């Protein structure tokens, strides 16, 4: 796995979480329904949640890369797969995160 594949998994997880949150029968969906929003307002809320999730994941990835702080601490971390191979060198996660979360890179087929 390289930095791009690692970030692609984060992006896929973001999409899965957003889809699951809006599924009927979930606590999140019940709370949104209880708000009594119009369909337009509900769409705006879903858009807001997507923006928030993007910002959170992007910031966390940059924090792991050393390009942003996590809390009050900014440092680079070495990401290893289960075999001990380095997934990303410094700067690799930042570049991949920008492509996926800011430029909207689509999954490769």
Regions picked out by a protein language model, each given a short descriptive name:
Residues 40-93:
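Amphipathic protein-protein interaction modules
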């Amino acid at each position: 796995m390289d930095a791009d594949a690692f970030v692609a998994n984060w992006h896929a997880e973001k999409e899965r979480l957003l889809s699951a949150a809006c599924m009927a029968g979930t606590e999140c969906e019940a709370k949104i329904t209880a708000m009594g929003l119009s369909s337009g307002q509900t769409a705006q809320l879903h858009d807001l949640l997507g923006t928030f999730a993007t910002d959170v994941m992007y910031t966390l990835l940059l924090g792991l890369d050393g390009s942003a702080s996590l809390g009050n601490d900014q440092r680079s971390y070495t990401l290893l797969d289960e075999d001990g191979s380095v997934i990303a060198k410094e700067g690799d996660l930042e570049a991949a995160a920008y492509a996926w979360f800011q430029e909207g890179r689509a999954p490769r087929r």
